């Protein structure tokens, strides 16, 4: 390992013989190859048959809610929590049960983990010196890194004299100083305020692209994942829900969970009135193109549509009357909360509109307007709560 903090502990290291995975393993040339990884803590299974390949130079985000298994997977890659079964290969070398100090990675934690009694210079140099580098060469390399992270004048300061963002830059430089093959980031920005977080994530991306280092970042922040990652791994309850580019995750969620978790999504209860007509509330519209689903006549389901793919219009046949409940100003646009007319107990529908349109239409709470679906990027998912009206039992294909 290229960086080791003295307070890191290895947990649940199997005693005696290591469990063997006798399943045939496909040959992979990916930089990091994870196959059928399971991690159990007593009777609780934190990771369930996780398989994932990461290419050299990729920036990958593990995204999901608390308890989904993303940090456990990161710790398995680092050797801090060894898998119960499965295999992990880095650069075609088996590392599944190697101790952290024998692995090729640098790691940055949410808590910075800097030594408070050492200066910035000493914090970055400690790993270099531990590997036998001369004082002169170590200080020369530290100077280069301080220049790179914008802290050239802070070499003699102590961590307590730095802001949170500056401390995290030092932690990043320390992790990268030994030129590891893999950089692991465990929610490194979550303790910072919003403005610093935005600035630092840009710096991390620039540094990652400049170095070309394979990077994995754990986060629960959708915006971080969407703006930073080449690919996102969405996790839930110890399984991978979807792997894809930020655009794929946002525009083509593979499951209802992904659709709910990433961004804002409206789930509009609908039913098939006929083979060509959709019923929404008390209105009927022509059946739009649904990307992931072929509906059956009489079936009930939820139509998933982003707020930016809805619009409020003057009345026409393909629009649904709604009552505006609230307008939320979000700087670049308004988010308009609506309910279907005559169905005040139904879930609200959110529409994102340009400021100029809201002003031109003189929209205000209590107004009745008409909701229209923009063509494209419509998806469908099964209802969470079963309707009292039996749905059609014909074979209908959902994504999830």
Describe every region a protein language model picked out.
Residues 3-8, 12-13, 265, 275-400:
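Non-catalytic connector elements of ABC transporters
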Residues 86-94:
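Conserved ABC transporter NBD signature motif
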Residues 50-61:
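Pre-Walker A (P-loop) beta-loop-beta motif of ABC nucleotide-binding domains
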Residues 78:
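Helix-to-loop junction immediately C-terminal to a conserved catalytic motif
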Residues 63-65:
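The feature captures the beta-strand-to-loop junction immediately N-terminal to the Walker
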Residues 59, 100-257:
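ABC ATPase nucleotide-binding domains
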């Amino acid at each position: 390992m290229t960086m080791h903090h003295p307070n890191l502990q290895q947990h649940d290291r199997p005693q005696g013989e290591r469990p063997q995975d006798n399943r045939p393993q496909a040959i992979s040339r990916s930089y990091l190859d994870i196959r059928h990884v399971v991690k159990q803590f007593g009777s609780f299974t934190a990771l369930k048959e996780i398989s994932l390949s990461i290419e050299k130079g990729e920036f990958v985000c593990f995204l999901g809610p608390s308890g989904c298994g993303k940090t456990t997977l990161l710790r398995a890659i680092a050797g801090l929590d060894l898998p119960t079964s499965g295999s992990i290969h880095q650069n075609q070398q088996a590392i599944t049960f190697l101790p952290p100090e024998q692995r090729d990675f640098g790691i940055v934690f949410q808590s910075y983990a800097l030594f408070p009694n050492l200066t910035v210079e000493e914090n970055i140099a400690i790993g270099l010196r531990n590997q036998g580098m001369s004082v002169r060469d170590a200080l020369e390399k530290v100077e280069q890194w301080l220049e790179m992270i914008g802290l050239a004048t802070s070499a003699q300061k102590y961590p307590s004299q730095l802001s949170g963002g500056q401390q995290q830059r030092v932690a990043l430089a320390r992790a990268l100083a030994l030129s590891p093959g893999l950089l692991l980031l465990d929610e490194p920005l979550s303790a910072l305020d919003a403005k610093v977080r935005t600035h630092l994530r840009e710096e991390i991306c620039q540094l990652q692209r400049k170095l070309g280092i394979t990077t994995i970042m754990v986060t629960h922040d959708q915006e971080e994942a969407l703006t930073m990652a080449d690919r996102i791994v969405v996790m839930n309850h110890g399984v991978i829900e979807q792997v894809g580019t930020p655009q794929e995750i946002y525009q083509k969620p593979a499951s209802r969970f992904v659709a709910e978790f990433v961004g804002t999504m409206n789930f509009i209860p609908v039913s098939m009135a006929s083979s060509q007509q959709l019923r929404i509330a008390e209105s009927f519209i022509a059946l739009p193109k649904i990307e992931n689903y072929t509906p059956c006549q009489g079936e009930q389901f939820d139509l998933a549509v982003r707020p930016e793919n809805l619009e409020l219009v003057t009345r026409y046949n393909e629009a649904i009357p709604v009552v505006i409940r609230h307008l939320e100003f979000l700087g670049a646009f308004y988010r308009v909360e609506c309910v279907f007319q005559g169905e005040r107990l139904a879930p609200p529908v959110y529409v994102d509109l340009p400021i100029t349109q809201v002003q031109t239409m003189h929209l205000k709470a209590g107004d009745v307007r008409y909701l229209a679906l923009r063509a494209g990027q419509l998806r469908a998912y099964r209802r969470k709560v079963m309707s009292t009206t039996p749905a059609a039992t014909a074979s209908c294909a959902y994504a999830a």
